């Protein structure tokens, strides 16, 4: 696989099921000219009752599928359980270690940052 990032590639989004579709809808609303690929891992849903190490592997598999199979230029982890088991900065570092400098965005950090801002005012 080439380590070149296709700037015309889609934004890849994954979740353990269908809940991340609300995140996908928000991305579409904010970036209407971008292509989106969504993977809902319904075969292993729900993640909440799974061993965290298994969830880490699921997240890795889904991220690599988005990069390898769909040539995603960015990844959104729309699953709180996956982002807690494999923090987005770790996933981003793993991709970068293979020469893939792809932004990985989660949903936990933005929510926590919003809470911090709201409680400091």
Task: Go through the PLM ranges and name each one.
Residues 2-121:
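Non-catalytic structural scaffold of enzyme domains
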């Amino acid at each position: 696989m080439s380590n070149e990032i296709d700037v015309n590639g889609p934004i890849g989004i994954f979740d353990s099921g269908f809940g991340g579709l609300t995140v996908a809808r928000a991305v579409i609303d904010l970036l209407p000219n971008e292509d989106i690929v969504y993977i809902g891992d319904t075969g292993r849903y729900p993640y909440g009752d799974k061993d965290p190490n298994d969830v880490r592997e699921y997240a890795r598999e889904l991220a690599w599928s988005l990069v390898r199979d769909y040539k995603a230029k960015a990844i959104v982890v729309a699953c709180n359980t996956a982002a807690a088991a494999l923090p987005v900065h770790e996933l981003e570092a793993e991709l970068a270690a293979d020469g893939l400098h792809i932004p990985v965005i989660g949903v936990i950090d933005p929510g926590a940052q919003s809470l911090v801002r709201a409680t400091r005012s």
